[in-house]
């Protein structure tokens, strides 16, 4: 009987095993985002015939109770995706490709925005139209993503910290080189990575709040060399020609870009070289102080309307990735600018007494700027080893010539040269991470200031002045850190040492400093908590000062899945003034301003707290962010300001002071890609109070400002409406009296009508500015443009500044000042431009 029972049990087990082995299981997912596809139809084909079919569950899984035979095939269909066949194997993960198709005259498409853990994936083909010329035109339409006027890219109002194309960083933080020149028709998708950790050796070990963006190109554009030529003719006084040429090749292993540009239309060619993040994680380098107030282009709005320029720029960037994933990159650039501008200013200060102190200025400037830079980087990013070796150098010369009403002329020349070499290495050894960083840099500058008067011989003698300061700055910094993991807890201990030697005015200023920074943090799926106290010891040898500066922070983050999270942090930091404040005892920085340095090293303490809440629903294309932060600043020194006969005199005094600041902001972005609509709304408010010193008197001030910024982009294939508004209100109080509230706003509207291959565009900007003690100023600037799009050519004719506006005027507040400025604009111009895409 016992043998019969055992035999029966074995028989049941064998049948169960056979039943289990006959079930064929698998998963159906989106090939772009990896998201599971529910209710997809899965058919099992044998010898070309369907023998069984099922539908996937909510997680994209399926199971077919059929014994597998050699040669069996899956056939999967799902609305919005291409039909897919593949052999039955051990994995059975079936990836479907999105496809638009016609079904009873209804166009069906896959979702344009998806989410995979901390990665938001935008299908750029769903946002691109034939009107779009470059990548920047496409990015501005993405919900949750904003592109600033200078080219900075933000996600939910926060600047991204890494921008790559095909996983490689060719631009090294210079976004405009790529976003202005990658063609819109060549892009496939954009991936926004929250908590971006680009260092493989630190992934799942060191958590970050950085945001990265990666652009993927279409297969037809990857590794292809393309050239873009953009010549133009500008009917001006005098009429002239200009333009640029770009050669680019983007791949996963090799990337290059070469640009040549010449412009007199008001464009800022230097924005191609604007750095929006530090591409290398190195020990810090030093910065050469500036002793004279070199003039610069003043621009309260689009600088292209104000810049009278003759500019040229050249650059080359080359990056390769070898079989071991090591990268080698080389970059070189040169730019030259000659810029002219005419401005007027009236400044009123509350410096005690019964009346305001007022100064005026009428100036015409000519800026001559030359800049050259070269950079080489060897980069390793392996699973257990990360490292960079960088050598770079740059040289520049800025000449600012300013003529003031009354015959006074000022010239400030600031040539400088900077050389640096840096290395960093990170190794993972089990639960330990060892990292060291070293840098050595040298800086040379020879600033010269000349002031002359043409009014008469007596005043020329009185006003003529010349000063020259030769600077040599040597700096080196080294740091070592050790990170060890204890389950979900991490301990990180860092040590840094720096030496800085500044020789100026025939005196050596040496700074020795060491920093100890232990950190403890906890990380799991729901919580992140960190605590990092630290201590810095500084020794200023020439000033004879030794200071012990504590710092530290506490950070708490709570994560609610992939939809929302909040974080709270509080930071305390003590710091000292830089060389610019203490190394030269007395100097004249421009024609009417003198600064007296302190005979001590000023010290400041800052307490900052921040609360932030994020919420997103990518499937509904909704993104939001709320922030509120407050800070208090304590200083051991104050700047005493005295104005006499229009001359500014600043003297550092030993006096304890404090200032407070509170800021709150809300950002919301919602997209409806089915109707090609994106909306944004940003709200912010700021309150600050502090103290200003004048002739020994203390003046308490307060400042209040709030801003409302709506945005709407509606861009179907037949037209585009682009609206941006910025409504700001601010007021200040010095002593007992509040100023009147200034309501300043800017409204931008662009309307494009598309008729086949022709785009008719009309754009306008309305500036409303309330002027102190005078009627409000309203300035309307408008441009009209016609673009004819052919297969590889774009031909456009634009009439700029339609109403031929001559000037623009505005008033702004500070804590104790009211400033009214007037700017002269570029005249009406006709531009003819052709773009060849080869």
Where are the language model's segments positioned?
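Short, acidic Ser/Thr/Gly-rich low-complexity loop/linker segments typical of extracellular
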Residues: 49-61
């Amino acid at each position: 009987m016992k043998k019969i029972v055992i035999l029966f049990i074995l028989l049941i087990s064998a049948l169960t095993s056979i039943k289990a082995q006959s079930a064929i299981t698998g998963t159906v997912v989106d090939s772009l985002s990896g998201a599971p596809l529910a209710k997809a139809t899965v058919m099992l084909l044998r010898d070309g015939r369907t023998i069984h079919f099922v539908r996937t569950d909510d997680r994209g899984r399926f199971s077919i109770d059929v014994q597998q035979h050699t040669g069996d095939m899956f056939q999967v269909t799902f609305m919005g995706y291409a039909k897919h066949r593949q052999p039955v194997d051990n994995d059975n993960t079936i990836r479907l490709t999105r496809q638009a198709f016609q079904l009873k005259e209804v166009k069906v498409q896959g979702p344009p925005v998806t989410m995979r853990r901390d990665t938001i994936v935008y299908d750029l083909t769903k946002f691109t139209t034939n009107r779009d010329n470059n990548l920047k035109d496409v990015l501005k339409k993405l919900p949750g993503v904003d592109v600033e006027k200078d080219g900075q890219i933000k996600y939910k109002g926060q600047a991204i910290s890494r921008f790559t194309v095909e996983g490689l960083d060719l631009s090294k933080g210079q976004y405009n080189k790529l976003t202005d020149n990658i063609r819109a028709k060549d892009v496939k998708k954009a991936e926004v990575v929250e908590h971006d950790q680009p260092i493989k050796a630190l992934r799942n070990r060191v958590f970050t709040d950085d945001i990265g963006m990666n652009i993927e190109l279409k297969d037809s554009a990857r590794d292809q060399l393309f050239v873009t030529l953009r010549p133009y003719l500008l009917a001006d006084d005098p009429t002239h020609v200009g333009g640029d040429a770009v050669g680019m090749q983007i791949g996963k292993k090799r990337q290059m870009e070469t640009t040549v540009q010449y412009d007199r239309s008001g464009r800022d060619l230097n924005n191609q070289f604007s750095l929006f993040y530090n591409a290398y994680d190195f020990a810090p380098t030093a910065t050469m102080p500036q002793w004279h107030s070199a003039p610069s282009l003043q621009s309260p709005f689009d600088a292209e309307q104000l810049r009278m320029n003759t500019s040229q720029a050249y650059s080359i960037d080359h990056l390769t990735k070898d079989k071991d994933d090591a990268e080698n990159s080389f970059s070189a650039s040169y730019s030259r600018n000659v810029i002219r501008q005419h401005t007027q200013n009236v400044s009123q200060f509350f410096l005690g007494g019964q009346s305001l102190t007022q100064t005026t200025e009428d100036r015409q400037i000519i800026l001559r700027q030359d800049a050259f830079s070269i950079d080489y980087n060897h980069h390793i990013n392996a699973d257990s080893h990360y490292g960079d070796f960088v050598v770079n150098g740059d040289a520049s010369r800025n000449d600012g010539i300013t003529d003031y009403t009354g015959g006074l002329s000022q010239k400030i020349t600031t040539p400088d040269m900077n050389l640096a070499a840096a290395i960093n290495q990170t190794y993972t050894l089990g639960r330990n991470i060892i990292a060291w960083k070293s840098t050595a840099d040298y800086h040379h500058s020879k600033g010269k200031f000349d002031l002359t008067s043409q009014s008469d011989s007596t005043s020329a003698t009185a006003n003529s002045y010349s000063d020259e300061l030769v600077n040599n700055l040597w700096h080196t910094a080294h740091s070592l850190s050790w990170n060890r993991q204890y389950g979900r807890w991490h301990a990180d201990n860092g040590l840094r040492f720096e030496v800085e030697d500044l020789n100026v005015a025939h005196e050596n200023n040496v700074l020795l400093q060491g920093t100890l920074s232990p950190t403890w943090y906890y990380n799991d799926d729901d919580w992140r908590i960190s605590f990092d106290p630290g201590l810095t010891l500084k020794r200023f040898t020439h000033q004879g000062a030794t200071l012990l500066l504590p710092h530290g922070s506490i950070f708490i983050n709570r994560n609610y899945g992939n939809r929302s999270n909040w974080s709270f942090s509080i930071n305390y930091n003590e710091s000292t003034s830089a060389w610019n404040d203490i190394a030269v005892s007395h100097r004249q920085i421009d024609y009417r301003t003198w600064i007296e340095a302190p005979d001590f090293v000023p010290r400041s303490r800052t307490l900052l707290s921040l609360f932030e809440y994020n919420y997103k629903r990518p499937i509904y294309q909704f993104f939001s962010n709320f922030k509120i932060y407050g800070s208090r600043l304590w200083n051991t020194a104050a700047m005493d300001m005295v104005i006499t006969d229009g001359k500014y005199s600043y003297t550092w005094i030993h006096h304890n002071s404090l200032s407070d600041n509170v800021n709150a902001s809300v950002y919301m972005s919602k997209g409806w890609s089915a109707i090609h609509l994106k909306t944004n709304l940003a709200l912010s408010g700021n309150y600050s109070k502090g103290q200003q010193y004048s002739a020994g008197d203390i003046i308490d001030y307060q400042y209040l400002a709030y801003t409302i910024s709506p945005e709407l982009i509606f861009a179907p294939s037949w037209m585009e409406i682009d609206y941006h508004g910025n409504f700001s209100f601010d007021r200040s109080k010095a002593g007992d009296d509040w100023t009147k509230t200034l309501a300043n706003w800017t409204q931008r509207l662009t309307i494009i009508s598309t008729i086949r291959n022709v785009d008719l565009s009309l754009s306008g900007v309305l500036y409303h500015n309330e002027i102190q003690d005078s009627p409000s100023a309203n300035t309307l600037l408008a441009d009209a443009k016609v673009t004819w799009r052919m297969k590889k050519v774009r031909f456009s004719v634009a009439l700029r500044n339609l109403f031929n506006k001559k000037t623009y005027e505005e008033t702004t507040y500070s804590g104790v000042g009211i400033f009214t400025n007037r700017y002269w604009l570029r005249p009406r111009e006709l531009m003819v431009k052709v773009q060849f895409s080869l």
